[in-house]
């Protein structure tokens, strides 16, 4: 089956040659290159092309995991997409190969740690919000609706659909304000 390589550097100043050579040595027939930040999956069209078109039994080859993803969450998203398609992931410089039992276990553990990281972040955020509320600093997100503006427009005879369209809210919200739900 096909082996598809992916080489990425953060900037155009960095050289992809070493990664490309390693991917060729790993038997990659196709190599996609990207010189962009790894901060966002969506901002990496070559990676998205590979994930969209890889087939069952094919292997996605990288040199190191940090070339693929900057966060456990993003890595888990990529691994899940590959798994759903029946494709494998191999890192040439690290013991990561999802076609083996050990490699599968490695990525399953990464998934556990990604969930743990998310839960820790939520806990820290909740603690920070609670502390800010105690100090009177945190007010939450400002409300999207301007109750007074809606009521004024209703009094002027505007219809709920026009008000909703103009203010970027749902018609239901206009009806709720009219009924007094948003006091």
Curated annotation (Swiss-Prot):
Gene Ontology terms for molecular function: DNA binding; DNA strand exchange activity
Resolvase/invertase-type recombinase catalytic domain location: 2-136
Entry keyword Cytoplasm: no
CDD domains: SR_ResInv
Site (Ancestral active site Ser): 10
Stored SUPFAM superfamilies: Homeodomain-like, Resolvase-like
Tree of life domain: Bacteria
One Gene Ontology term from the biological process aspect of the record: DNA integration
The entry's keywords: DNA integration, DNA invertase, DNA recombination, DNA-binding, Plasmid, Transposable element, Transposition
UniProt xrefs under InterPro entries: Homeodomain-like_sf (IPR009057), Recombinase_CS (IPR006118), Resolv_N (IPR006119), Resolvase-like_N_sf (IPR036162), Resolvase_HTH_dom (IPR006120), SSR_resolvase (IPR050639)
Family to which this protein belongs: Belongs to the site-specific recombinase resolvase family.
PANTHER family to which the protein is assigned, alphabetical: DNA-INVERTASE FROM LAMBDOID PROPHAGE (PTHR30461), RESOLVASE HOMOLOG YNEB (PTHR30461:SF26)
Protein's name according to its UniProt entry: Integrase-like protein y4lS
Source organism: Sinorhizobium fredii (strain NBRC 101917 / NGR234)
């Amino acid at each position: 089956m096909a082996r598809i390589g992916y080489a990425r550097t953060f900037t155009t100043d960095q050289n992809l040659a070493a990664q490309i050579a390693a991917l060729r040595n790993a038997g990659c027939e196709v190599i996609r290159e990207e010189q962009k930040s790894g901060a966002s999956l969506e901002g990496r069209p070559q990676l998205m092309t590979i994930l969209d078109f890889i087939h069952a039994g094919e292997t996605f080859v990288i040199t190191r995991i940090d070339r693929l993803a900057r966060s456990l969450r993003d890595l888990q998203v990529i691994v899940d997409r590959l798994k759903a398609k029946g494709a494998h992931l191999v890192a040439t410089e690290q013991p990561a190969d999802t076609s083996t039992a050990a490699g599968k276990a490695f990525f399953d553990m990464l998934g556990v740690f990604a969930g743990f990281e998310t839960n820790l972040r939520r806990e820290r955020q909740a603690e920070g919000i609670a502390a800010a509320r105690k100090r009177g600093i945190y007010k939450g997100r400002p409300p999207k609706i301007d109750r007074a503006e809606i009521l004024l427009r209703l009094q002027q005879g505007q219809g709920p659909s026009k008000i909703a369209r103009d203010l970027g809210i749902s018609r239901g919200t206009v009806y709720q304000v009219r009924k007094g739900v948003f006091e």
